[in-house]
């Protein structure tokens, strides 16, 4: 999907509520610095100072819209950034520009960092000749999941399930609580009805076969080494060709190609949201017609 079209996925009401909570967190009371800047009309240039993928425009826009400011973008969502790049301009009352500055930069930097990591992972997978799905996980920051899942999509990865209601995931603790793989999958199938798929986390070929026999749609081979993963997936697919196989656990950008194989359908990576470094952006007010280019430290 075109990155610019992904903004349609974001519910306006949810987006507005998130932005409101972020701004209230940063300034719940008196804003003394507003007396320094004043309320005169001002303009600021948004600069990208590190390479990566630009992501998070809808959040950036929503923050400044709530503060009666206008954003003009010079690069589309999903663009590859080559520093130093002038990405956008923001216009509005000075105290409003500065009130939204840090919240907007934090959101854009984090979202772009995740999109950049996702894009690198997809590129590594395609470079290995693999055409399956690179996906994120539910290992996201509480209260910030919408931004992080959106960043995955801009980077070309799959978001995986958004929340507990998107897929019935039977994990190891569910198996223990239910009293075995078969009982757990049976209960999951009954709960899922015809609307949801059931995925089962497995730590051995035996568990994977039990899960598939019990009716799992997807089998998650968790924390398998590559030399164990591919033989297990081969045997499983031979017996259950319609069952999708997901690999997860300990997968990084460096070792990702080792997990790519003809019997692996999905590779999920927690590091895409947990370890992706934020990109470096700055927002600089300027008085002249041409904004000065910031230095990279």
Swiss-Prot record:
UniProt-listed GO biological process terms? NAD biosynthetic process; NAD metabolic process; quinolinate catabolic process
Impact upon substituting residue 102 to A/Q = Reduced activity
Q: What is the effect of changing residue 171 to A/S?
A: Loss of activity
Q: Which reaction does it catalyse?
A: nicotinate beta-D-ribonucleotide + CO2 + diphosphate = quinolinate + 5-phospho-alpha-D-ribose 1-diphosphate + 2 H(+)
User: What EC number(s) does this enzyme carry?
Assistant: 2.4.2.19
Q: Which residues bind quinolinate?
A: 102, 138-139, 160-161, 171, 201, 222, 248-250, 270
So, what pathway does this thing act in?
Cofactor biosynthesis; NAD(+) biosynthesis; nicotinate D-ribonucleotide from quinolinate: step 1/1
Cellular component (GO) terms are: catalytic complex; cytoplasm; cytosol; extracellular exosome
What's its top-level EC category? Answer: transferase
* Protein keywords: Glycosyltransferase, Pyridine nucleotide biosynthesis, Transferase
Q: Name one GO molecular function term.
A: identical protein binding
Instruction: Note the InterPro entries from the entry.
Output: Aldolase_TIM, NadC, NadC/ModD, Nicotinate_pribotase-like_C, Quinolinate_PRibosylTase_N_sf, Quinolinate_PRibosylTrfase_C, Quinolinate_PRibosylTrfase_N
Q: Which domain of life is it from?
A: Eukaryota
Q: State the family named in the UniProt similarity comment for this chain.
A: Belongs to the NadC/ModD family.
Report quaternary structure and partners. Answer: Hexamer formed by 3 homodimers.
Instruction: Report the protein's function.
Output: Involved in the catabolism of quinolinic acid (QA).
Q: What is this protein called?
A: Nicotinate-nucleotide pyrophosphorylase [carboxylating]
Name the species this protein comes from.
Answer: Homo sapiens (Human)
